[in-house]
Amino acid sequence: MRWLAYLAGCLIVGVVAMQVYFFLQIAAWQVVNPSSTTFMRAERWRLCGFNFWSCPVQRQWVRYDEISRNIKRAVIASEDADFVNHPGYELDAMLDAWERNKQRGRIVRGGSTITQQLAKNLFLSSEQNYLRKGQELAITWMLELWLDKQRIFEIYLNSVEWGEGVFGVEAAAQHYFHTSASKLSVGQAARLAAALPAPKCFDKKQYCANVHVNFRVKASIIARRMGAATLPD
């Protein structure tokens, strides 16, 4: 039994060390921009395999004040209307997701806020299970502890996936509309926000087999809601 205790101890030490790494990494992002994310690295590997390090993805960091208010409002309206007020998660949405997942017998809905989405994008995989969800909540707490809402939103807009190998709002603006993130119109912003649940499908039809989103209808709904969106300015 001694070896079981040893293995358990090693596991606990490993888990604690991982949390310390996440904690210190997020603290550094108060002043340093993340150079990459788990999703970016996974996409590089998917596209290029062993040529991972030389595989380009489209991404260019832009400061928060260089990003159009239209896309900020569109993303808030689409993804997390109460972003500026909640502590990183919404209990009602999580409980609703829990009930739906119990009915389906598996995780099909996450009830994720923008901060939770960022936690997943930065550090975790797209795998759906309760252990990963627990880690996501821990990272969400760390993000909200160290970073203010504007910084969280800035990192999110510069890191989120917007197509095949397309990450961040500047790359998305250039890729789809041949413009900069600072010049996105209301219509363009609404279309980009509509793409967020299924960015690869929005980019290329070959990824749409299991996607059931009418991007045009969703964009029109987002455009109508943008005026009520509250930004972390």
Curated annotation (Swiss-Prot):
It is found in: Cell inner membrane. It is a single-pass membrane protein. Its main location: membrane. Keywords: Cell inner membrane, Cell membrane, Cell shape, Cell wall biogenesis/degradation, Glycosyltransferase, Membrane, Peptidoglycan synthesis, Transferase, Transmembrane, Transmembrane helix. Belongs to the glycosyltransferase 51 family. GO terms for cellular component: peptidoglycan-based cell wall; plasma membrane. Pfam families: Transgly. It is an enzyme of class 2 (transferase). One of its GO terms (biological process) is peptidoglycan biosynthetic process. The chain crosses the membrane at residues 4-24. It catalyses: [GlcNAc-(1->4)-Mur2Ac(oyl-L-Ala-gamma-D-Glu-L-Lys-D-Ala-D-Ala)](n)-di-trans,octa-cis-undecaprenyl diphosphate + beta-D-GlcNAc-(1->4)-Mur2Ac(oyl-L-Ala-gamma-D-Glu-L-Lys-D-Ala-D-Ala)-di-trans,octa-cis-undecaprenyl diphosphate = [GlcNAc-(1->4)-Mur2Ac(oyl-L-Ala-gamma-D-Glu-L-Lys-D-Ala-D-Ala)](n+1)-di-trans,octa-cis-undecaprenyl diphosphate + di-trans,octa-cis-undecaprenyl diphosphate + H(+). GO terms for molecular function: pentosyltransferase activity; peptidoglycan glycosyltransferase activity. Peptidoglycan polymerase that catalyzes glycan chain elongation from lipid-linked precursors. The keyword Cell membrane applies. It comes from the Bacteria. NCBIfam families: mono_pep_trsgly. Pathway: Cell wall biogenesis; peptidoglycan biosynthesis. This is Biosynthetic peptidoglycan transglycosylase. Its EC number is 2.4.99.28. It comes from Cupriavidus metallidurans (strain ATCC 43123 / DSM 2839 / NBRC 102507 / CH34) (Ralstonia metallidurans).
